Amino acid sequence: MVIIHSPSYDLHNHEGHVENSGRTRAILRAIESSDLSPRFVEPGMAGIDDILMVHSSTHVEYLEVFAGRGGGWLDYDTYMTPESFSVARLSAGGAMLAAEEALRDGWSYSLGRPPGHHATYDRSMGFCIFNNIAIAIEHARRNLGVSRPLVLDFDVHHGNGTSSIFYRDRDVMYISIHQDPRTLFPGTGFIDETGSGEGEGFNLNIPMPRGSGNREYLWILGMILPAVLEGFRPDMIFVSAGFDAHRRDPLAEIMVDEEFFSWIGWFIHQTGLPCTAVLEGGYDPEALGRSNIAFMRGLDGEEYEPETAAPGGVSEIFSQLSDRFSAYFNF
């Protein structure tokens, strides 16, 4: 069990903002109070050339200058401190190192911030500076021999940045389960956003109704994930690990709890594939700590017997997905 973390992540911090250094401190406290014994590894910064694998040079240069002038607000909810450019490079470097460790040890977890899955090719947004998981994926493809990565994003918000970066790529399978984008930021992640060009069919969104809980999440993922794994045949799994779908989280209206995070960790473990998880959202400190422990136990192979899954109000969503992806996967 390998966790990538640096105390320097705390230098990107705004105490009046929900995305603050207390998030990772809550997770570290939960680990310390548990019986888990991970090996902690401190990362180095991603090189500028690494960042440019998924971001434009103009955008990267702008962020460096912006932070150098003292930082501030990139938009209405995304901040930078004077240290944020370096810390964001460190967070991306942590995700890259996590990919390397997963290929050696089976699974790893980049416990870094700022998060990344909303960052697009040329824009930082949604608390995200650089797209950490996309950088790690490109590092794995170009340098580590990975050819068919699958991305599972269970953050409650659609990972519009990751989706857009790989939208035309047939060799990266992106799956996101998130709250209905008609009711939540960033307003993307509809069923008909399936990829384009050669990437058509390799971008799969599962928009969940407000109030969905463990039973609905387990049912629809249990119907979809095995079929996608069989059809796509990935050689590595990358997880955008957001915990803001928890019922206690203040930013959304999905109602899962630790049982879901236990199950999804255990499901990934059962695939036998190397897995890198990268921290995304989760804004209730207590729930964030408990959910991370549950997820890590599952990834580490602790068997989990889920509660009875049931379609509830999501059977129509599954029907639409089945029709839309019938040419690609046998749901």
Curated annotation (Swiss-Prot):
Site entry: Polarizes the scissile carbonyl of the substrate: 283
Residues that coordinate or bind Zn(2+): 155, 157, 244
InterPro entries membership: HDAC_PDAC, His_deacetylse, His_deacetylse_dom, His_deacetylse_dom_sf, Ureohydrolase_dom_sf
Enzyme nomenclature, EC number: 3.5.1.-
Principal EC category: hydrolase
Active site: 118
GO biological process, one term: epigenetic regulation of gene expression
Entry keyword set: Hydrolase, Metal-binding, Zinc
Cofactor detail note: Binds 1 zinc ion per subunit.
One annotated GO molecular function: hydrolase activity
Cofactor(s) needed: Zn(2+)
TM spans (from-to): none
Family of the protein in this entry: Belongs to the histone deacetylase family.
PANTHER family: HISTONE DEACETYLASE HDAC1, HISTONE DEACETYLASE HDAC1-RELATED
Function of the molecule: Probable deacetylase.
The protein's name in its UniProt record: Probable deacetylase MTH_1194
Organism (species): Methanothermobacter thermautotrophicus (strain ATCC 29096 / DSM 1053 / JCM 10044 / NBRC 100330 / Delta H)
